[in-house]
């Protein structure tokens, strides 16, 4: 087997492993355009993970997803967080509660609260700005 064949085999193996990691192993031969919205997001995350980053920055990764897809995405993010940091920009606080260890709340470009989800949700500044009380 020549060197390029070995490289091709290694790449295929890595793709198969990643497809399993992002729960798309049954969709390896499906065109991306035929995937569900959630599956397309998972594919994007998988493409990022192929580069083995230490930091992922995800902007509203569950926007437009069904409740089940949001749950599966939370599970995926928990699975892939070992050995890397994941920063998620998200307005869906129910989703944030599923995944976050630490929450930072910004308003007009300024940090107004930071801590656990419970701490942030009970912060008077957050309540005033986002709930209008």
Regions found by a protein language model. Give the residues of each.
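Short, small-residue-biased leader/transition segments that mark boundaries at the very start
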Residues: 1-3
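Conserved ABC nucleotide-binding domain
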Residues: 18-39
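Catalytic Walker B motif of ABC-type/P-loop ATPase nucleotide-binding domains
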Residues: 56-60
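Helical segment within the ABC ATPase nucleotide-binding domain
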Residues: 70-82
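A short, surface-exposed alpha-helical micro-motif characterized by mixed small hydrophobic
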Residues: 96-98
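ABC ATPase "signature
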Residues: 114-115
């Amino acid at each position: 087997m020549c060197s390029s064949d070995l490289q091709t085999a290694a790449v295929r193996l890595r793709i198969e492993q990643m497809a399993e990691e992002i729960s798309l192993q049954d969709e390896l031969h499906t065109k991306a355009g035929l995937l569900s919205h959630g599956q397309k997001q998972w594919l994007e995350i998988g493409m990022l993970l192929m580069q083995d980053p230490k930091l992922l920055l995800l902007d509203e990764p569950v926007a437009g997803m069904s409740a089940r897809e949001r749950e599966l995405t939370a599970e995926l993010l928990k699975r892939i967080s070992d050995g890397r940091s994941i920063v998620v920009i998200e307005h869906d606080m129910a989703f944030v509660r599923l995944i976050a260890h630490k929450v930072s709340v910004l308003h007009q470009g300024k940090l107004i609260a930071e801590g656990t989800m419970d701490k942030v949700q009970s912060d008077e500044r957050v309540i005033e700005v986002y709930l209008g009380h």
